[in-house]
Design a protein with these regions (language model features):
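Compositionally biased terminal segments of proteins
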Residues: 1-198
């Protein structure tokens, strides 16, 4: 199960989301973009934030549909927790091939109406976003998977099925990955229980 795009609600009115829009606006100004919009697909914590409004992050994991130069000094200051400022910036080292990704992740990404003229901005679907967290499965990744499930955006069964479908395309040793899948599915199941009793 994955929430259909028509039912998805995006939190585009938060300080972090407004900062994300400003970051893309600044990038298109720096690059002097004037042609048709370039597709940008966002993963990571900022995508989780757009779905849940819970996650706070400073780096933007974005994959572009064209080769772009990302200025190293490009960033936007946004209010963060406790009144401290965050420097929101693109992660120039982001590479989706390091994560577990289903072969259809770009096709199934969901458009976010941020209102940026020369970027067509998408985020990973909830289930693909959860699956992308599995290869590393840090504390933040675990929390992100739980948050997506607790918000009713995906399920343990959907995550397991999508992750197993993605395994043949993973570059590297899949044995640790299979253990991570089992852990991620258990995290999702526990989140489902919390959701059902909330």
């Amino acid at each position: 199960m994955n929430a259909p795009p028509s039912r998805l609600k995006f939190h585009t009115d938060t300080d972090l989301a407004k900062g994300l829009k400003a970051l893309f606006v600044e990038l298109q100004a720096r690059l002097e973009l004037r042609d048709k919009p370039i597709k940008a697909t966002i993963a990571g914590g900022i995508a989780v934030h757009l779905y849940t409004a819970q996650r706070v992050t400073m780096d933007v994991d974005a994959e572009f549909g064209a080769r772009l130069y990302l200025p190293q000094d490009l960033g936007i200051e946004v209010p963060g927790p406790g009144g401290r400022s965050l420097w929101l910036h693109f992660d120039a080292q982001y590479n989706s091939t390091f994560a577990l990704m289903h072969e259809d992740y770009l096709d199934d990404a969901v458009r976010v109406p941020l209102g940026v003229d020369y970027f067509d901005i998408y985020i990973l679907s909830p289930v693909d976003l959860a699956v992308s967290k599995i290869s590393r499965l840090s504390a933040n990744d675990r929390g992100d998977i739980a948050a997506l499930v607790e918000h009713g955006l995906t399920t343990a069964a959907a995550i397991e099925a999508r992750a197993r479908d993605a395994l043949p395309g993973f570059v590297g040793n899949v044995r640790p990955l299979e253990m991570n899948i089992a852990d991620a599915v258990e995290i999702a199941r526990q989140a489902e229980k919390r959701r059902s009793t909330a």
